Regions:
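Conserved S-adenosyl-L-methionine
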Residues: 2-107, 115-117, 126-128, 143, ...
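Conserved catalytic-core motifs of eukaryotic protein kinase domains, centered on the activation segment
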Residues: 120
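Glycine-rich S-adenosyl-L-methionine
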Residues: 128-152
Length: 184
């Protein structure tokens, strides 16, 4: 809902208010509304030109809306980085200047599709998941959460909208929750 998006935006912007430059990433960007709202909230504390936007979206028609919506809101196109791909299958964003080539950002925000099926096969060594465990094939909620965590800087912030089931489901999800708590 729009109200949740606005709340997330204000929380993220306040957390980042003392930074001169920030990078924000939405791995399930849809039309880009979360990024737009965060950019608007963050611009209370910093120049709009000091914000870099990273967006990834699986659906091609929605992916096209992301960049268009960001540009239509007056965001400098050179600060927009978008990709049409499957977030869980192909890790992005990357930084080829670093090793490993993962891009860490100041904020990751997302509203992924709830309890979507995914393919965990062959991902045991994927650094996004290997430390905490693999989400069950029938529910990718924790796969999205772990992807998001993997991309934040140590002093960064993450906000994500997930179904309440992630708080109490058993099996693999319980093990991931336990690992997240134990590893702080």
């Amino acid at each position: 809902p729009h109200e949740v998006s606005l709340l997330m935006s204000e929380i993220v912007a306040y957390h980042l208010k003392d930074k001169e430059h920030i990078a924000i990433y939405d791995p399930t960007s849809g039309s880009g509304s979360l990024l737009i709202n965060i950019g608007h909230s963050a611009s209370k504390y910093m120049s709009r030109d000091s914000i870099r936007y990273y967006a990834q979206e699986l659906k091609e028609n929605t992916y096209n809306l992301t960049r268009m919506n960001l540009v239509m809101r007056g965001i400098n196109p050179s600060n927009i980085f978008t990709r049409n791909a499957d977030t869980l299958e192909d890790d992005w964003p990357i930084d080829l200047e670093s090793y490993p080539p993962v891009l860490r950002v100041d904020a990751v925000v997302s509203n992924p599709p709830y309890s979507q099926q995914w393919s965990p096969e062959g991902k045991e060594l994927d650094p996004r998941y290997s430390e905490y465990g693999l989400a069950p094939k029938s529910k990718a909620d924790y796969a999205f959460l772990l992807h998001d965590l993997y991309h934040i800087k140590p002093d960064g912030i993450m906000t994500i909208v997930l179904p309440h089931g992630v708080l109490f489901r058993c099996g693999e999800e319980e093990r991931i929750r336990t690992n997240l708590i134990e590893k702080n």
